[in-house]
A protein has these predicted regions:
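Active-site environment of divalent metal-dependent phosphoester hydrolases
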Residues: 28-29, 50-55, 75-78, 93-96, ...
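Active-site-proximal loop/helix segments of hydrolase catalytic cores
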Residues: 112-179
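Active-site neighborhood of phospho(di)ester-bond hydrolases with catalytic His/Asp-centered motifs
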Residues: 21-23, 41-49, 69-72, 134-139, ...
């Protein structure tokens, strides 16, 4: 299993046969590692529809003819924009594929698309390649994060926002790390723009001194193997 960080909150998960793309904000992203036109995903998963997460979803999905998974109101808008394969779960809902599954989890944030569609933001619990990956989405710290790993879903890798201002900051993210108890944490949603600049190395030091989790800091374009 490989996890490639593409900048901001965008990741590509690959088990060798399948490539799953999360929150493909590439065009207009000063930290983007690739052009949207370079990607051929098997599926696109969205945490929510703010411009820095929805990004290039529609263009990529149309070109690659791949499904998009998003919460129901956001999925309806994407389908209305010409994407043929759209899956529309709500919080707590699971969608299964031949490569694995994705479940929408709560996230504390706001969400409205650039065209004005309000919807509920989500986190993503993903099963792929025999691993469980938790992308927290944009969120504040909240205690129900403890429940995400219930029913034996131990988190192998957490993709965690740490930038503050629009989401929890690195100090709250340390508390989130204690709740989630992931094997590895990859920080994201920081340093893309001035309001979310932070010290990722300090986050790594705090997490590794206060929890059993390891932190892998990736630069855009770098890959973590698990």
């Amino acid at each position: 299993m490989e996890i490639r960080f593409l900048g901001h909150a965008c990741f590509e998960l690959s088990d060798g046969d399948t490539r799953v793309l999360i929150d493909p904000f590439l065009t207009g992203n000063p930290k983007a590692a690739v052009e949207a036109s370079e990607l051929e995903p098997s599926a696109i998963l969205l945490t929510h529809g703010h411009a820095d997460h929805l990004g290039d979803t529609v263009d990529i999905a149309k070109r690659a003819n791949c499904p998009v998974v998003a919460i129901v109101e956001l999925a309806n808008e994407i389908g209305g924009n010409g994407v043929e394969q759209v899956f529309d779960p709500n919080i707590g809902g699971t969608v299964k594929f031949d490569w694995g599954w994705v479940k929408l989890t709560p996230a504390w944030h706001t969400a409205v698309t650039p065209s004005g569609t309000p919807h509920t933001p989500a986190g993503l619990l993903i099963g792929i390649g025999g691993k469980t990956i938790y992308h927290l989405g944009d969120t504040a710290l909240f205690s129900d994060m403890k429940l995400v790993a219930h029913r034996g879903n131990a988190i192998d890798v957490a993709l965690m926002c740490i930038g503050g201002h629009y989401t929890m900051d690195r100090l709250d993210a340390v508390e989130a790390a204690k709740f989630i108890e992931a094997g590895t944490i990859i920080p994201c949603h920081y340093d893309t723009f001035p309001p979310i600049e932070t010290d990722a190395e300090a986050f790594k030091s705090d997490v590794e001194s206060e929890t059993s989790s390891k932190v892998q800091i990736l630069q855009p374009g770098e890959t973590h193997s698990t």
